[in-house]
Amino acid sequence: MSIKEQTLMTPYLQFDRNQWAALRDSVPMTLSEDEIARLKGINEDLSLEEVAEIYLPLSRLLNFYISSNLRRQAVLEQFLGTNGQRIPYIISIAGSVAVGKSTTARVLQALLSRWPEHRRVELITTDGFLHPNQVLKERGLMKKKGFPESYDMHRLVKFVSDLKSGVPNVTAPVYSHLIYDVIPDGDKTVVQPDILILEGLNVLQSGMDYPHDPHHVFVSDFVDFSIYVDAPEDLLQTWYINRFLKFREGAFTDPDSYFHNYAKLTKEEAINTAMTLWKEINWLNLKQNILPTRERASLILTKSANHAVEEVRLRK
């Protein structure tokens, strides 16, 4: 089916891997194999081929959008007769736990910062905006970590609102996966980036998710381009369990790790524990809160085995 025929039936243009890879045009590869190895997640196979065929075309598309946005800002400044403030272009990346959002974010940050324009690209994860464990315990939400109600949404919305308002120095809290908590007094200062990549589970949520509270303001209201990283549920579960097993042999062995006790589990016990955590927390959050937002994304990356993207859908 031609792209023209597809547009009559869906709000998305659909590309298989080869079609999407052809859109790279002549964009040069700016990352080495060593750099790619440092960017990938604990449980992912990220190759030069994946970067070349998926992420270089995506960085080219984003560069077009960002340049267009800057021209629009210049038109407004000319109309108003002002010297405009630096307003960052915000890209959000959503998707399930274990799907590879963080790797996608890091690769895009590296690629976008190496375009000839040398734009400053900041990466912030919404994990830092989780309520501290003490608050979650008081509210009975420790088993709902990652669900919308576990976040300090007011602070997260204020963060992106301040950036879009041109506030020069904006602070974001930082989360530690070692201690499984927000780091006290560990805020990171973001200083007028050209591009902000915001990575998190629920960054595509909108007023549609809260019909009882129609006056809510959401992160998605400030996002210029949104990406949803998708994969079949059976693969997500497998990736989550495999990641848990690797943490059991790595990060969990640190005596300071919140999950240090998991390091003592047998492999069978670890698999059963990971399965329980997946089904009772992460799968539930995916079905209730994350997956329903997928079709709001500007672009959907669908992965198959080995974290390889097999299909790209771009909102027209």
Curated annotation (Swiss-Prot):
Record has Cytoplasm as a keyword: yes
Pfam families: PRK (PF00485)
Subcellular location(s) of the protein: Cytoplasm
Binding, ATP: G95, S96, V97, A98, V99, G100, K101, S102
Coiled-coil residue spans: none
GO molecular function: ATP binding; pantothenate kinase activity
Pathway named in the protein's UniProt entry: Cofactor biosynthesis; coenzyme A biosynthesis; CoA from (R)-pantothenate: step 1/5
Keywords, in A-Z order: ATP-binding, Coenzyme A biosynthesis, Cytoplasm, Kinase, Nucleotide-binding, Transferase
The family this protein is said to belong to: Belongs to the prokaryotic pantothenate kinase family.
Catalytic activity: (R)-pantothenate + ATP = (R)-4'-phosphopantothenate + ADP + H(+)
Any one biological process term the GO annotation gives: coenzyme A biosynthetic process
Main location: cytoplasm
Gene designation: coaA
EC number(s) recorded for this UniProt protein: 2.7.1.33
SUPFAM superfamilies: P-loop containing nucleoside triphosphate hydrolases (SSF52540)
Name recorded for this polypeptide: Pantothenate kinase
HAMAP family per UniProt: Pantothen_kinase_1 (MF_00215)
Enzyme's top EC category: transferase
PANTHER family, alphabetized: URIDINE KINASE
One Gene Ontology term, aspect cellular component: cytoplasm
